[in-house]
């Protein structure tokens, strides 16, 4: 796994000392702390010679026993860090990584509370990375930063071409409740009531 590879590389660095040919790697403890923050400290991550284990409410779990939300976050965040360490090998702190990251439907398998927090958490840990998200969740929009710019992407039914709306600015949406945001032109939900029924749904946006 990514964490075990991190540990092996760090041990290799310690053995070889000040070898300038070795790339700098983010400390394993820093990565673990990042995961703990993203997982809301509900899961303890234990790295040992036997592998990586997770402890939740006193129970020891394998990776496959974690919830889909936890697994999803761990997989793509690990992949993100790994790719940045490969492309920027002399960076030793997470907040120094620079680049652009595209994430499709970040809300998948996440509880609404987590959806609202996740973008702010990522911005805190990676302030020099520009994140571009796609989402179908108004809760993700609620959690976006004040300087976020939002576009509605849609397919023109006449031409079949994909287009975008004019820009929405997050700071101009802060007054809206979640149900108001869902029924706004940005999402186009016809009615926010639970009992509302509709005969047709346009999912092309």
Predicted regions and their residues:
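Switch/communication elements of ASCE P-loop NTPase nucleotide-binding domains
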Residues: 51-193
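Coupling/switch segment of ABC-type P-loop NTPase heads
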Residues: 1-36, 179, 183-188, 197
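Accessory N-terminal region flanking or inserted into the helicase ATPase core
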Residues: 23-31, 37-39, 53-65
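Conserved helicase/translocase motor-coupling segment
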Residues: 200-205
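Short beta-strand
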Residues: 43-47
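Short coil/loop linkers at secondary-structure junctions
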Residues: 41-42, 190
